């Protein structure tokens, strides 16, 4: 079975020895007995009990592993107080052994980063272990539909995924501590750079900035891998530090904070349709507030809490204006009066004047407040939906150049359309729709023609994130809750693709685009292309991909094990036996000196399996065996071959474009008219030449005369003398038809490539080559015939040559 082989390749041997996996082999034996005795009702119960017992064991192991990771992360966080800016050479083994002893006096930034990377590596291995267990259970349940009469029936089977749910165990606290450590390390390294160069980091002159935002879907299984790529570069950002409060109150800590928004529209959903059609001036109005992370009730809002009145206006590129978002804050008790046009804004103006706001700021405030309430009255807007999510933001201080936000637990609930004469619905029985994925938004602010950071390029192109441009929580909520009503004329393009599996483990490897290769697949074509385009760095590699290094290949597992032994005191408390001294000498330590120095220099005993394992071991196993372990329609797990499956190669000549490599959500694109017009002109050029050639062929057929043929042709048979002009004309017409077909097929292929927005060459790599070869061959043949006809008898001495 492909899954059985992939499972054996995907497990981590050290975790397997600790009992961290569902025993697929033992479970498969029960499935085989179920297949042999399909009518036995006790076999499904035996399988359920076996799975539940194994999940209980795995759950306990996960709890223990999380506590272990948290202990190491807390020790590193405490040691980061002693980060030094000096280039001090230290013994890494000594640092690891004293990590949890409280004797840390000096910690270089590079070693602190190495320790943080090793903890991150171990944490991602733990996540992969949990994900493989989930895939195993899904695969087993999928096979039960074949082997059992009625499949997994009974109420207890409905709870098999929720019983001992190890995915509910939070790892947010570990990520928070690692984020703080990375932030301190980066700050220390920047201070070291400032001391060396004397130029403050980030000092730039006046620049013109380009702002853009890209949204992605991330499966919850893959979310830790995305966070692990962010925290080494951007720290966790929050308005209110809740970590210590959660520790004191014994409350589970989460990275996110509640964000709630109430969107306003009319009964015909005018703003929704205009927004979905991307019309010039499309407007969106909402009221947003930020909840307390320590509160379980996200709807809780006090009378004096701030509520932001926001308006977003879309502008097309041809308008010369940029889409913008503007907002101002009011107290919750003032919102009802404001939306009904009864609120006196003079006190708010006086507060702004007291804060020494400029006249322009006062003018903008009055314009914005008047614009929102005017649109509410003009379009008869009412509260229609409410979106709520837990948002985790990653940003370095007040630097707006790079900001990443992650929205989880996204839910959309219906409002009462103003029937309660309140700006939001205060009941508890509203219909709710839950979004299955996390939403990652990357906001960039960079100067014109400035290259973005390599790690951002790597993050945006990694297989863990699925790009969904123009994704809108408001549009999704309207389509989810009211899409069945006659008032909704259209829905977003992603609504029918929510059931597509976007897990990274089901995606093939993404090969980096090489612009020197293009459509060429052979060695000769590659050599020719590189001779033309060159072999420079910018031509041969994707820009930024070669520099974006995440967790370079280091023995992180061994570093983590050493740190863990040092925290537990096992490295110091190891008995000073002869074997230990030999181990210390093998590690490069010294067995001489005082007893205290010996204890510090001794290496802790490590298991024999401290080998380096990739964090994407499961994905590599699935890719090797072409296995995609997810069940469609709840029936069977599917396998796709790379030749004929969903990721088959493009048939460029016929113009068929398959799924983009590593991409599952199909996105409609706007096409540049100039590109299509250029392609049409290219086709018309070929059509023009084909038409001329075809007319010449038709003229030869109609008006040709064999009497005007050369003398060597008149010596042929009577048939050829009478029909030679017809044969010649037909040949010309066939060449013209082939040229027309080539022009049409090339135009279609290029158009589809433009539609798909694939990173491949748009020029024709075969047509000019074939045409040049045929012309060169024809010229050579004609030249050789003339040379042989004129100089052949002289060179050979034969008059009959």
Curated annotation (Swiss-Prot):
User: In the UniProt record, does the keyword Transcription regulation occur?
Assistant: no
Give the UniProt keywords, A-Z: ATP-binding, Manganese, Membrane, Metal-binding, Nucleotide-binding, Transferase, Transmembrane, Transmembrane helix
Could you identify this protein by its name?
Vacuolar transporter chaperone complex subunit 4
Q: A Pfam family matched by this chain, by name? A: DUF202
Q: Which residue ranges traverse the bilayer?
A: 693-713, 724-744, 769-789
Q: What is its main location?
A: membrane
Instruction: Tell me where in or outside the cell this protein is found.
Output: Acidocalcisome membrane
Which stretches face the Vacuolar side? Answer: 714-723, 790-801
User: What function is annotated for this protein?
Assistant: Component of a polyphosphate synthase complex that utilizes ATP to synthesize and translocate polyphosphate to acidocalcisomes in epimastigotes, insect-stages of Trypanosoma brucei. Catalytic subunit of the vacuolar transporter chaperone (VTC) complex. The VTC complex acts as a vacuolar polyphosphate polymerase that catalyzes the synthesis of inorganic polyphosphate (polyP) via transfer of phosphate from ATP to a growing polyP chain, releasing ADP.
Q: Does the keyword Nucleotide-binding apply?
A: yes
Q: Which organism is it from?
A: Trypanosoma cruzi (strain CL Brener)
Q: What class of enzyme is it?
A: transferase
Q: Which GO terms describe its biological process?
A: polyphosphate biosynthetic process
Q: What happens biologically when this protein's gene is inactivated, per the record?
A: Results in growth defects in procyclic forms (PCF) and changes in acidocalcisome morphology and number. The mean number of acidocalcisomes drops by approximately 2-fold, but individual acidocalcisomes are considerably larger and less circular. Also affects cellular polyP and PPi content. Short chain polyP drops almost 2-fold, while PPi nearly doubles.
Organism taxonomic ancestry: Eukaryota, Discoba, Euglenozoa, Kinetoplastea, Metakinetoplastina
Q: Active site: which residues?
A: 473
């Amino acid at each position: 079975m492909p899954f059985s082989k992939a499972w054996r390749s995907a497990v981590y041997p050290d975790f397997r020895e600790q009992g961290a996996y569902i025993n697929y082999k033992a479970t498969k034996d029960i499935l085989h007995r179920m297949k042999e005795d399909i009518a036995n009702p006790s076999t499904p119960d035996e399988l359920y009990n076996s799975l539940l017992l194994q999940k209980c064991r795995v759950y306990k192991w996960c709890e223990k592993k999380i506590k272990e990771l948290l202990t190491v992360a807390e020790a590193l966080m405490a040691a980061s107080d002693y980060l030094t800016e000096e280039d001090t050479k230290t013994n890494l083994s000594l640092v690891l052994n004293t990590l949890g002893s409280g004797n840390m006096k000096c910690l270089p930034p590079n070693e602190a980063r190495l320790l943080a990377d090793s903890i991150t590596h171990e944490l991602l291995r733990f996540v992969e272990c949990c994900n493989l267990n989930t895939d195993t259970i899904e695969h087993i349940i999928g096979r039960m539909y074949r082997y059992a009469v009625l499949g997994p029936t009974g109420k207890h089977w409905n709870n098999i995924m929720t019983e001992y749910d190890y995915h509910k165990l939070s790892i947010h606290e570990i990520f928070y501590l690692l984020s703080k450590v990375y932030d301190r390390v980066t700050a220390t390294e920047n201070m070291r750079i400032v001391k060396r160069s004397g130029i403050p980091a980030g000092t730039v002159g006046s620049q013109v900035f380009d702002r853009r935002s890209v949204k992605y879907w991330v499966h919850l299984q893959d979310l830790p891998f995305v966070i692990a790529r962010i925290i080494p570069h951007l720290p966790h950002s929050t308005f209110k530090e809740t970590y210590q409060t959660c520790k004191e109150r014994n409350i589970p800590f989460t990275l996110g904070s509640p964000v709630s928004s109430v969107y306003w529209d009319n009964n015909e959903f005018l703003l929704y349709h205009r927004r979905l059609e991307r019309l010039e001036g499309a407007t969106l109005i909402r009221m947003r507030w930020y909840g307390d992370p320590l509160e379980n009730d996200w709807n809780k809002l006090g009378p004096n809490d701030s509520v932001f009145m926001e308006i977003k206006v879309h502008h097309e590129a041809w308008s010369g204006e940029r889409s913008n978002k503007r907002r101002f804050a009011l107290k919750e008790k003032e919102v009802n009066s404001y939306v009904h046009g009864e609120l006196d804004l003079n006190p708010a103006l006086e507060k702004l004047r007291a804060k020494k706001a400029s006249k322009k700021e006062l003018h903008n405030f009055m314009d914005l407040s008047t614009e929102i309430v005017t649109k509410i009255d003009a379009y008869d807007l009412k509260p229609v939906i409410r979106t709520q999510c837990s948002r985790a933001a990653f940003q370095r201080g007040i630097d707006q150049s790079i900001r990443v936000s992650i929205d989880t637990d996204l839910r959309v609930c219906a409002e009462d359309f103003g029937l309660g004469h309140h700006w939001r619905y205060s009941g508890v029985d509203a219909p709710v729709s839950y979004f299955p994925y996390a939403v990652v938004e990357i906001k960039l602010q960079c100067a014109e023609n400035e290259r973005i950071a390599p790690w951002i390029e790597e993050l945006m192109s990694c297989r863990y994130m699925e790009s969904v441009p123009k994704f809108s929580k408001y549009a999704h909520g309207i389509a989810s809750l009211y899409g069945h009503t006659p008032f909704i004329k259209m829905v977003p393009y992603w609504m029918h693709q929510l059931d597509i599996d976007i897990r990274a483990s089901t995606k093939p490897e993404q090969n980096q685009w090489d612009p020197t290769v293009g459509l060429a697949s052979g060695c000769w074509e590659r050599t020719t292309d590189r001779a033309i385009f060159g072999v420079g760095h910018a031509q041969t590699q994707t820009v930024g991909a070669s520099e974006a290094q995440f967790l370079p290949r280091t023995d992180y597992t061994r570093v983590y094990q050493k740190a863990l032994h040092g925290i537990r005191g096992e490295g110091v408390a190891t008995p000073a036996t002869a074997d230990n001294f030999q181990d210390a000498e093998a590690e490069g330590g010294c067995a001489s000196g005082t007893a205290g120095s010996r204890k510090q220099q001794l290496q802790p005993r490590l298991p024999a399996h401290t080998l380096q394992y990739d964090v994407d071991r499961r994905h590599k196993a699935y890719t090797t065996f072409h296995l995609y372990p997810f069940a469609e329609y709840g029936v069977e797990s599917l396998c796709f071959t790379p030749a004929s499956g969903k990721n088959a190669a493009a048939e460029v000549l016929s113009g068929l474009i398959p799924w983009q490599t590593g991409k599952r959500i199909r996105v409609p694109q706007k096409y540049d008219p100039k590109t299509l017009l250029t392609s049409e002109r290219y086709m018309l050029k070929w059509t023009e030449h084909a038409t001329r050639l075809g007319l010449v062929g038709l003229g030869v057929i109609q008006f040709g005369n064999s009497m005007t043929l050369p003398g060597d042709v008149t010596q042929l048979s009577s048939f050829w003398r009478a029909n030679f002009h017809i044969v010649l004309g037909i040949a010309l017409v066939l060449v013209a038809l082939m040229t027309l077909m080539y022009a049409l097929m090339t135009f279609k292929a290029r158009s589809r490539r433009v539609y798909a927005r694939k990173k491949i060459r748009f020029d024709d790599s075969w047509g000019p080559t074939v045409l040049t070869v045929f012309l060169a061959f024809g010229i050579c043949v004609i030249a050789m015939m003339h040379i042989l006809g004129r100089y052949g008898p002289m060179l050979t001495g034969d008059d009959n040559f």
